[in-house]
Amino acid sequence: MTTDWNFEATYLELRDIFYDRGPIHPVDNPTLVLFNDALAASLGLDAQSLKQDIDLLAGNRQTETSFSQAYAGHQFGNLTMLGDGRALMLGEHVTPNGKRVDVQLKGSGPTEYSRGGDGRAALGPMVREFIISEAMHALGIPTNRALAVIQTGEAIMRQGPKHGAILTRVASSHLRVGTFQFAAGAGSIDDVIALTEVAIKRHDPDLIDAPNRYEQFLGRVVERQARLIANWQLVGFIHGVMNTDNMFISGEGLDYGPCAFMDTYHPETVFSSIDREGRYAYANQPYIGSWNLARLAETLLPLLGETKEEAVDVANKQLTRYTELYKEAYFTGLAHKIGLFVRKDGDDELTDELLRLMMETEADYTNTFRSLTLGEIESLPFATRKDGKVWLGAWRKRLNGQGLPDEDVSRIMRQYNPAVIPRNHHVEKAIQAAERGDFGPTEAILTILRDPYNYDQSSEYVSAGPPRTYPYQTFCGT
């Protein structure tokens, strides 16, 4: 185990329109309040040494490889030039086994791209990101992860004074659809080519010498996003702000500000306070994924064909695969969630009917599948309805047709149905306690969420449904 970071910065091989290397903005009284020992170990770093020297994670020490990224983004459908307005990339850490990851500080102070903001972050949203990213990782869904949260000792203004904080975020890269939009809008075709080559080298190195590598690269991004969004849908996750600057080329999730997990099932569920039109509602997420990928394809058109018509045909060939790939991943996953492990004709209709019953009876999304997994049929809110009994009979008949013992079906179903998710009211309680200086509830919920498929846990976080006394709203915390 090493105590040293091994930073490089291949991103800086791009033209300097892609980044800013401005000064750091130190804080006077940093305190480490959350740390991810397991992540540190996976990066080949000694956790204790990092905890004892927090100046780097507090943004008080600059690296030779640090920079802030420029990018654009369609925010609720409107294209805007953006950039890391409150983030500093420390560099690309290369682990002892050769894996390359970005290490970024969020809330580290103003940059060239701050647009008048203070560049800081509040403690509550950083704790939320830490919790949600760890939950997503444990669920097996590709995601950036949080290494640490530093409380800065400074107050910042966000609808009143809040504790300032800095999150250390680790990701396969921070290349976004919005990075390509920036290259196409503020740069030249040569800049788009250079960025694409960097992305291929980083995420799809097997394509480096492929003659049609740009088309294949687009196809790889399509595949990764189709799988990611299908996985979100399968656990009832609502991102809340699926702007193009929040879509990673790597296929990892990022920016867990206004996100939440669905309690009561309804396809039109929206949590984000700023999504007034429901653009990023649960049911819309697959379509927004397709829309965002079309924006990526637009930036790559000059690389995809000799003529515009040829390029559009090539792009459309890859984009049309998205719906097929998404549906395959989603409906296969949904079948697994109800114990069907080889899909047959009629299975999609069976799962569709289940979702209709869940919506009409205001069933809890996670607990419905948990009850089916455990065979606790009487706890289902539609169990006594006529159409509910019809569905349960059809489901049982389909299960029996597989020829597997019930205990084997239940055991396998547990691999697809988490016993616990980050319940919104529990996350809020942890955040509120953290804002009072008590991080015990955060550590407690993290312990549970890091083992989400463990049905043997005895905890209030596992089986307790949400209170129905208020509509839950999330805020980005910017």
Swiss-Prot record:
It catalyses: L-seryl-[protein] + ATP = 3-O-(5'-adenylyl)-L-seryl-[protein] + diphosphate; L-threonyl-[protein] + ATP = 3-O-(5'-adenylyl)-L-threonyl-[protein] + diphosphate; L-tyrosyl-[protein] + ATP = O-(5'-adenylyl)-L-tyrosyl-[protein] + diphosphate; L-histidyl-[protein] + UTP = N(tele)-(5'-uridylyl)-L-histidyl-[protein] + diphosphate. The active site is at D245. InterPro entries: SelO. Disulfide bonds: none annotated. Pfam families: SelO. Mg(2+) binds at N246, D255. The keyword Oxidoreductase does not apply. It is an enzyme of class 2 (transferase). ATP binds at G83, G85, R86, K106, D118, G119, R169, R176, D255. GO terms for molecular function: AMPylase activity; ATP binding; magnesium ion binding. Its cofactor is Mg(2+); Mn(2+). Its EC number is 2.7.7.-, 2.7.7.108. It comes from the Bacteria. Keywords: ATP-binding, Magnesium, Manganese, Metal-binding, Nucleotide-binding, Nucleotidyltransferase, Transferase. Belongs to the SELO family. HAMAP family: YdiU_SelO. Nucleotidyltransferase involved in the post-translational modification of proteins. It can catalyze the addition of adenosine monophosphate (AMP) or uridine monophosphate (UMP) to a protein, resulting in modifications known as AMPylation and UMPylation. PANTHER family: PROTEIN ADENYLYLTRANSFERASE SELO, MITOCHONDRIAL. NCBIfam families: PRK00029.1 (NF000658). This is Protein nucleotidyltransferase YdiU. The lineage of its organism: Bacteria, Bacillati, Bacillota, Bacilli, Bacillales. The gene is ydiU.
